[in-house]
Amino acid sequence: MRITAIAAAVLLLAACTPDEIVPTAPMALDGVSFEVEALPQAEGPCDPAQPFPARVTWDVTDWTDPKFDFLLGSTNGQLVARDNTSKGELVTDPWAREGLWILFVDRNTRLLVAAEPVPALVCPAD
């Protein structure tokens, strides 16, 4: 009986989980500015084929309780950072690659606020 109740609770919670969203085009809700910029590697020669850091900037107006998660690939993706401010900037470690989606999600509601793919790394001319 106890196992049945636990199983029912797990199924009920799973049913309440929001559907996974995998972005296919850049987006941002009204009043949200969200940008992703590719940065050259700090050490060694600039090589677009190798992972590189990315700079993420955001500015959200009129957000009651700014608590945001930065996820990779989808709304169920890997959590890479958290922030509790309506405006800010973060620079990632060198794991970014062209086309990797970075999602900006409200931590309280799981609402997708913005999404942008990492752009191609353009190396400075020698």
Summary of predicted features, one role per range:
Residues 1-8:
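Sec-dependent signal peptide recognition
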Residues 12-15:
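C-terminal motif of bacterial Sec signal peptides marking the signal peptidase cleavage site
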Residues 17-19:
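Bacterial signal peptide processing site
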Residues 24-25, 110-126:
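Edge beta-strands of extracellular beta-sandwich domains
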Residues 50-56:
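Structural beta-strand segments of beta-rich domains
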Residues 60-67, 97:
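Short proline/glycine-enriched turn/loop motifs at strand-loop junctions of beta-rich domains
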Residues 79-86:
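Short beta-strand segments within Ig-like beta-sandwich modules, predominantly Fibronectin type-III
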Residues 91-101:
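Surface-exposed, short loops/turns at beta-strand junctions within beta-sandwich domains
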